[in-house]
Amino acid sequence: MPPKRRLVDDADAMEDQDLYEPPASLPKLPGKFLQYTVGGSDPHPGIGHEKDIRQNAVALLDQSRRDMFHTVTPSLVFLCLLIPGLHAAFVHGGVPRESYLSTPVTRGEQTVVKTAKFYGEKTTQRDLTELEISSIFSHCCSLLIGVVIGSSSKIKAGAEQIKKRFKTMMAALNRPSHGETATLLQMFNPHEAIDWINGQPWVGSFVLSLLTTDFESPGKEFMDQIKLVASYAQMTTYTTIKEYLAECMDATLTIPVVAYEIRDFLEVSAKLKEEHADLFPFLGAIRHPDAIKLAPRSFPNLASAAFYWSKKENPTMAGYRASTIQPGASVKETQLARYRRREISRGEDGAELSGEISAIMRMIGVTGLN
């Protein structure tokens, strides 16, 4: 019940009320806003000069030397040493030659905050040992796997799988013992470099170049491992739906809103495979704009059903943190649970389905309901 209005008995008070005027409106704002300074000075990594790559790399094998620079700088230098020509590509992409120092150095009246020279006066020009080269391989292997899958956190979670890939590569290079002993950089994690590279506008072009270049040995063996990881990386929705359509044995497939999106999914994926051919499995890794056509929002009901099924059937998906029911979906989890109780037939006669649903089910080998 609204509060009663208080009666004003005082004549002066009544007069004051009659004379009340609302405050004047605020003056119009000019529309200006705080601006970033031109050529912002946020600390950034660098790659040094091309002629110094090897000497910089030798110096940065030492942890005390690495600690002097931006945490991403050593990883970029190791990559430039690993792949000749990458330095020029990085420069073209806007990567600075100068790296910020972790702590500014004062020399007389001058304070140095960044430099393109990463080696010291005592750093000798020498060839790398085989174990040093393998250690750089190991670091860059983890780094590039993190780049193609788009996440440093997945590198931390899948450390054992990455070690297995590195051991496989070392065995292919006839240096199986290095799979265990190439540990000179094991305390230098590539996680910050992964996140930095993944934040660059050229990351997709970088990955595409790696995947489409014919490298000589040992680059071929190295990239073979990267390609295995890059295949269908960042395409979880696509791979989950494909597995669902091929292996699901319950009637969630026949829910009308799910079934109609199956037809759409098959059409879109077939068109993308035709357009991109051998590059189709790498659309996610190279950040191709067409990858969004296979995102959950394109097939929200089908994706919801696929994630629901996969979380029930696939132990590796049990910890998948994304919501089961995708934005834009009309199917409900209770509906999926109800349809899951009934099985479908594949290759054998079963209870007949309605005409349009039946035609869609035949596309994925479903012949009826049990």
From Swiss-Prot:
Location of the motif Nuclear localization signal: 3-11
Note: Isoform P38 does not have the nuclear localization signal, nonetheless it is localized in the nucleus.
Entry-linked Pfam families: BDV_P40
Keywords: Capsid protein, Helical capsid protein, Host G2/M cell cycle arrest by virus, Host nucleus, Host-virus interaction, Modulation of host cell cycle by virus, Viral nucleoprotein, Viral penetration into host nucleus, Virion, Virus entry into host cell
Biased composition (Acidic residues): 10-19
Function according to Swiss-Prot or TrEMBL: Encapsidates the genome, protecting it from nucleases. The encapsidated genomic RNA is termed the NC and serves as template for transcription and replication. Targets viral NC to the nucleus. Could be involved in the transport of nucleoprotein particles from the nucleus to the cytoplasm. The nuclear export signal is masked by the interaction with the P protein.
GO BP of this protein: symbiont entry into host cell; symbiont-mediated arrest of host cell cycle during G2/M transition; viral penetration into host nucleus
Residues spanned by motif Nuclear export signal: 128-141
Region listing for Disordered, in residue ranges: 1-25
Subunit structure: Homomultimerizes to form the nucleocapsid. Binds to viral genomic RNA. Interacts with P protein.
Subcellular location: Virion; Host nucleus
Protein name: Nucleoprotein
Gene of this entry: N
Mutation effect (N56S): In strain: Halle B1/91
Chief localisation class: virion
Family matches, as InterPro entries: P40_nucleoprot_BD-vir, P40_nucleoprot_sf_BD-vir, P40_nucleoprot_sub1_BD-vir, P40_nucleoprot_sub2_BD-vir
Cellular component GO terms, alphabetical: helical viral capsid; host cell; host cell nucleus; viral nucleocapsid
KW Ribosomal protein (keyword) present: no
Organism of provenance: Borna disease virus 1
